[in-house]
Amino acid sequence: MALIDVIGWVGKRRWARSVGVPMMLAARRIPLATMVRLAGRRICIPSAGYSAIALSGTSVRDNLCDGALMFETLAGAIERFGLEADGTASDLTIEPQACGCPVTMPDYDTPYVSEHPVSTLEDIRALEVPDPLTDTRMRAMVETVRRLSERFTLLTVAGGSGPFTLAAELIGATEAAIYTLTEPALMHELLEYCTRVCATYLDAIVRAGAEVILIGEPTAAILSPGAYAEFSGAYTARLIAAIPRPVILHICGDAGHLVKGMCETGAQGLSLDAPVDLPSVAQTVPDNVVLIGNLDTVSVLLEGTPESVSESTTEMLESMRPYKNHVASSGCDLSYNTPVENIVAMIDTVRDFR
């Protein structure tokens, strides 16, 4: 039995907590890449938070506003899928809403920011840093993490927005891109504020029991390497330096041009989307940085069959066989409507791969 299987077996059993807790405390002293190499086989961590909600028969809206319900939803998915880590559903509207952005929250789809309230320097200076323990939705996520860490001794993965992505929600993505060229001083002041918000929220997530932090910086994909270094990477690096846990950095879409800059942030793991050629990237990424991904969430996992998912998963694993710093995952968050049998096919294929 591989070490990751032992950890998973212990981590799911309440009565084994006296063994699991010391294991998790020991894991905090080990770099993420070392943990991956010691696992004994390839690890699979699909971004299945929204699929877990579908499996539970509850709504996205209810889960993202109720920490206790989200915990029950995720606990059910851990048991159903036999997940090797527990993690919250990705929701990058939490911080924007706490900062004053109106958010539309469908019952069965991902929420989104519907208005961008910031447009001037005066608007930025009027913003306050929300308290994660009193803001309703931040508090719900903190509670979910706390309950997960109290119930399971698995690697609890949780996190939030990166500074540039939060800034883009406050001011608008198009405006954020333009202002990096025309109003850089304004953008830097906004990013200073956003970094404080992210740091405060992620500190609460860590204190609640998260073992690995995931920073989602999807909007940074619109930046050139130089602009990324100045307007995202520098702030992300400051954020990571203040977090006493391994950090995974995710950028959606074709972020291949940003991989070098992502490595320079100090992130111990890079989560890359399906458009990125993972084997090519693996040749340039240091072996102490974990590469996570990157099955296509739509054409493979949403629209495929268990047989085609297994085939695509095997192809990915074979292409990454030379690289021991790889963790199999979906390229991005799985859709609410992703068939359960396709998720199971991916997980089982990874577990059986030797």
Regions found by a protein language model. Give the residues of each.
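Short, glycine/charge-rich beta-strand/loop segments that flank catalytic centers
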Residues: 88-98, 157-166
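Active-site-flanking structural segment that lines cofactor/substrate pockets
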Residues: 51-82
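Short active-site-proximal "capping" loops at secondary-structure junctions
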Residues: 49-54, 91-95
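Aromatic- and acidic-residue-enriched segments that line the glycan-binding/catalytic groove
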Residues: 63-64, 98-112, 165-179
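Active-site loop segments of alpha/beta catalytic cores
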Residues: 1-51, 60, 130-354
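A contiguous, low-structure linker/loop signature
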Residues: 91-133, 147, 154
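Intrinsic-disorder/low-complexity, polar/charged segments
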Residues: 66, 120-121, 135, 305
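Catalytic domains of carbohydrate-active enzymes, especially glycoside hydrolases
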Residues: 70-90, 204-211, 264
